[in-house]
Amino acid sequence: MNYDNYINNSIKTIPPSGIRRFFDIANEMDDVISLSIGEPDFQTPWHIRDEGIRSLEKGKTWYSPNRGFSELLNGISDYFERKFGVKYEADKQILVTVGGSEAIDLAFRTLVNEGEEVIIPEPSFVCYEPLTVMAGGKPVIIKTKNEDSFRLKAKDLEAAITPKSKLLVLPYPNNPTGAIMAKEDLEEIAEVIKKHDLLVLSDEIY
């Protein structure tokens, strides 16, 4: 039986992650410091681990509500208001996911229609392109430059926009370069976004 005949054609176009291949190779070697995957180099703080243990002891091992536990949703809402001065309604505007990749996947599949374009600055997180393809969209890549400190420039964004452009991914602080957008750059990009009525996915995992 040729199982390839049963695979979604869009999946066949997605190559395996090169960085994951390096990760697997490094894991098999001794005395190697792996710089392949961006993850914290510190343990989860004990007060967080203790709370997880307490939840298990209380029997919270079942399905959660679809949006997440109300205590967590309210805590997230309070954090954003305290930290950034913005108010999100816990029961309407916040959704808890199992990690950032699931959040990006859900956002793309919710917002992107067949053939619509998702603009992605590179270098970037390896999942943006395949998740765009799986959502039926078309990745449009903007190569950021070393001389710009790998920051997205408004003129480059403007040049990449077409009538099919739907969404811009803003991955800053950037994975993997660590680049941070200057306020002036963001203000210029905001004008382009408003001019063309683009949606923005702000991936702030770093």
Which positions does each model-derived feature cover?
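Conserved PLP-anchoring active-site segment centered on the Schiff-base-forming lysine
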Residues: 108-132
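Active-site phosphate-binding strand-loop segment of PLP-dependent enzymes
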Residues: 140, 144-206
